[in-house]
Structures are given as structure tokens and as C-alpha cells.
């Protein structure tokens, strides 16, 4: 079961009636539900109870990281919890010089123009407000945000901030996977300012494409992403500005190799091997 929607719950009950083992994927937590849309903070405690009910329908629970595993253990789940990465398609997401050309042509960017991108829904948790403030602090840099969301669920604060965005910010909306890959290959920095993640699939995609990446220094990255080895980490908007400025002038070739190495260790093939071992354990 891969979602916490009612159809997955029904499917889990049917599987149990048929004496089948159920693996429930624990991608959602109360922590990453908060600050997501209008009313999400009020609904968060109810959401926590619901996902606990869902996850306990599984014989085991699989969650992407050690961080999310510890969160779910703290919920008092009755099932054994395994941490297995979401993984990334490293055959698709990989460095591509032609992708850089396509990206810059599409958005009418010169080869010399510095470009910072981010990817995510237009929600507070993803750091959209900080992204806009960062752009104001770096007016000579082009900032592009990929992703959108249901406009009726976007908070008034974010709508107002977007309406007053600085001129160097472009909201590209949702794009196809190949266009997003071109963006990873064509921009200078991937700035992921999210406050809470269970892993961050877009981070894996960025690492696979070897774009210099800066993330917020939050617990989910502990143990697998090191500051100034595979990524840069920052806490304040000022730190993001300073480190991005430094990236523009640094030789990042060694870091790119480390990025790709991390991504390859989380390739879909590696994920498949881990899942296969789990399946055999359950027999």
C-alpha cells in the first residue's frame, strides 16, 4: 500500500481477508503534513491518528529514511518498521550537457546568467517564502520555482507573497520529467529550503544530475548527506545567500562526483534488491 487514501485501506483489508501479507509504505508523517495547506496544522493530530491506523494494517511498514523511521516509532506503531529509500532513476536523471542548452534556450537565459532553481508544491513547509526573500537578496541571479498546487488550498500569505514576487523570480509550474531533468542539468544551483521531509525525492534527482545542491540543515539529511561533501547545508536565509554566492565561484567537480555516488547508492536497482530481501523475509 503506497498511500493513506481510503482506496489503499480497502485494498489492505481485502488482502488480509485473502491471507496475503501487506507492506505499507510510510511516506507521510504528521510533521510533513503540517504547514502544507489551509487548515493543515489544525488537522495534523487527526491526520496522525489516521496514518497510524493505516500503517498498522500492514504486516510491516517501509519508510524512506532512518529519520522518518524514528518518527513513526515514536507514534507507537505496532508493526516493524524498515527504512528503505524511495530511490531515484539514475538512468533517467543524469548529467546531460544538451539538457543545459535546452533549458537555457527555453527560458531565454544566457550561458553566463546565474540560475538558482527549486522544486516543490507552493506550501510554506517547502520554504517558498524564504525562496522569495532569498531572490530579493540576490537581484542579479535568476530564480525559478518548478511545481504548483491546488490554488484553493494555497494560504493567503503565500498567495500575497507570490503576487509581490521580485522580478528575478519565475514560477514555471508543473513541467514534464524530461524538462525538469533539463533544469537540473542547466541551472547553477538547486536550493531546497524545505523545513521538513521524509527524504526529499527531488534532492535525489538533483544529486543524480550533479547540480550543486544546498539544503536546509534539518535532521532528515543526517547520516547520509555531509555539509560541503555531497551538498551544502544552511539554516538562515543569509547563510543560503552566502553559500550560493560561494558556489558560483568554486570548483565543484569533486562534489559533483560525490553527489552522483550518493544517488547511485539509492538507484532503483538497489531499492529493488532491498525490497526483494524484505519480501523473502516475510515468507
Tell where the protein language model's regions lie, with residue ranges.
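Nucleotide-sugar donor phosphate/pyrophosphate-binding loop at the beta->alpha transition
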Residues: 21-23, 31-54
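Carbohydrate-associated surface elements
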Residues: 67, 87
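Glycosyltransferase donor-sugar binding loop
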Residues: 88, 119, 142-157
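Short alpha-helical donor nucleotide-sugar binding micro-motif in glycosyltransferases
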Residues: 174-175, 182-187
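Aromatic "clamp/platform" in nucleotide-sugar-dependent glycosyltransferases that forms part
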Residues: 195
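Short hydrophobic beta-strand element within catalytic cores of glycosyltransferases
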Residues: 212-215
Amino acid at each position: 500500500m503506497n498511500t493513506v487514501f481510503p482506496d489503499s485501506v480497502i485494498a489492505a483489508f481485502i488482502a488480509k481477508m485473502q491471507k496475503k501479507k501487506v507492506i505499507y509504505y510510510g511516506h507521510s508523517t504528521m510533521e510533513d503534513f503540517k504547514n502544507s495547506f489551509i487548515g493543515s496544522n489544525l488537522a495534523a493530530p487527526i491526520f496522525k491518528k489516521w496514518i497510524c491506523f493505516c500503517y498498522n494494517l500492514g504486516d510491516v511498514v517501509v519508510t524512506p529514511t532512518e529519520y522518518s523511521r524514528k518518527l513513526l516509532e515514536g507514534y507507537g506503531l505496532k508493526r516493524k518498521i524498515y527504512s528503505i529509500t524511495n530511490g531515484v532513476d539514475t538512468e533517467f536523471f543524469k548529467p546531460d550537457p544538451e539538457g543545459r542548452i535546452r533549458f537555457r534556450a527555453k527560458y531565454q537565459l544566457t550561458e553566463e546568467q546565474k540560475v538558482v532553481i527549486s522544486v516543490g508544491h507552493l506550501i510554506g513547509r517547502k520554504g517558498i517564502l524564504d525562496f522569495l526573500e532569498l531572490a530579493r537578496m540576490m537581484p542579479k541571479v535568476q530564480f525559478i520555482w518548478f511545481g504548483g498546487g491546488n490554488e484553493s488550498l494555497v494560504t493567503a500569505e503565500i498567495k500575497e507573497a507570490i503576487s509581490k514576487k521580485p522580478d528575478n523570480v519565475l514560477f514555471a509550474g508543473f513541467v514534464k520529467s524530461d524538462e525538469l531533468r533539463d533544469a537540473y542539468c542547466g541551472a547553477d544551483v538547486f536550493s531546497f529550503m524545505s523545513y521538513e521531509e521524509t527524504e526529499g525525492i527531488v534532492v535525489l534527482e538533483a544529486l543524480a544530475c550533479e547540480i550543486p545542491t544546498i539544503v536546509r540543515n534539518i535532521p532528515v539529511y543526517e547520516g547520509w548527506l555531509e555539509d560541503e561533501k555531497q551538498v551544502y547545508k544552511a539554516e538562515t536565509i543569509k547563510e543560503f545567500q552566502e553559500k550560493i554566492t560561494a558556489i558560483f565561484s568554486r570548483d565543484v567537480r569533486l562534489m559533483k562526483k560525490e553527489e552522483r555516488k550518493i544517488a547511485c547508492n539509492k538507484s532503483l536497482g538497489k531499492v529493488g534488491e532491498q525490497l526483494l530481501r524484505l519480501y523473502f523475509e516475510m515468507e
